[in-house]
Each structure stands twice: as C-alpha cells, then as structure tokens.
Amino acid sequence: MNKGEDNLVRTSITVPEQLLQKVNELIASGYFASRSEIFRQALREYLQRIEWTERVGDEEYFGALTYVFQHERAEPELVKVQHEFTDVIISTTHIHVSPEKCLEVLLLQGPGKRIAELAKRIRGVRGVEQAKLTVVSSEGE
C-alpha cells in the first residue's frame, strides 16, 4: 500500500459495461488483484500526468498529443483550439476510425507550459473521448 493510502474510502463509479468487462478480464488474467487496485493505479497515473501540466514551466519540450473524438460533436471546436496553438503544433495527422469517430495526433514543440495548456484545452472539448499527452524534454531528461 502506498503512503497516504491507509485511510481508504469506499466510493462508486459508473462505467460502460464493455469497459468493466475488460477490467474483469485483466483481473482474471492476473494483471491486477482487484477492481479497486486497477482503478487506484489508473487514477494515480492519470493524476501524475495532469499534475505535470500544472507545474511545468517554459522549458522546451517535444511531444505528441493523441486523442479520439466524435467527429460531428467536437471537430469545429478542435479546429478553433488548434488555430490558437499554431506556435507549438508542428504537424497534425487525422485518421477516420469509424463514420462517427476520428483520431488525431498533434506533434508538438515549444514551451512546456504552452503544450500543457493545449492538452488541457483539447481534453476539455465536448466529444473528446480520450486524450494522451506524451512529452520529452529537449534536454533529453
């Protein structure tokens, strides 16, 4: 158990049935001990990524922001956001996943704070279902 987790609190969440089925399959395969453990680990990882966006400064980073979205619902707002961040977006790739969904990958270079703000804005667009930011320092650290 991690430090600070000795006072666990019970809560409940609502997830799509297919997602819960995948969680149960991972547990049955031995990847995780329980549903609680998989959700705790996923939350820790997600919160660490979000916390980076809150503390990063103006150091230069390279990165990729990959996201899946509902085409008709999100695309107009996504285009607007992308136009506000042309200073850090160096390339965009767009793939049609299905008639309703698309995947985009933005290749990024620039101040970490600006990249973090872009990721925050993309995640906040209604219709974005998943978004993952991966960054590396230009210093190689």
Swiss-Prot record:
Gene3D superfamilies: ACT-like. Chain A, domain 2 (3.30.70.1150), Met repressor-like (1.10.1220.10)
Binding locations of Ni(2+): H83, H94, H96, C102
UniProt-listed CDD domains: RHH_NikR_HicB-like
Record carries keyword DNA-binding: yes
Keywords per UniProt: DNA-binding, Metal-binding, Nickel, Transcription, Transcription regulation
A GO MF label: nickel cation binding
This protein's record includes keyword RNA-binding: no
SUPFAM superfamilies xref list: ACT-like, Ribbon-helix-helix
GO biological process, any: response to nickel cation
Swiss-Prot/TrEMBL cofactor(s): Ni(2+)
Cofactor note: Binds 1 nickel ion per subunit.
Classification via InterPro entries: Acetolactate_synth/TF_NikR_C (IPR027271), ACT-like_dom_sf (IPR045865), Arc_rbn_hlx_hlx (IPR013321), CopG (IPR002145), CopG/NikR_regulator (IPR050192), Ni_resp_reg_NikR (IPR022988), Ribbon_hlx_hlx (IPR010985), TF_NikR_Ni-bd_C (IPR014864)
Family listed: Belongs to the transcriptional regulatory CopG/NikR family.
HAMAP family with a match to the protein in the record: NikR
NCBIfam families per the UniProt record, alphabetical: PRK01002.1, PRK02967.1, PRK04460.1
Summary of the function given for this chain in its UniProt record: Transcriptional regulator.
Protein known as: Putative nickel-responsive regulator
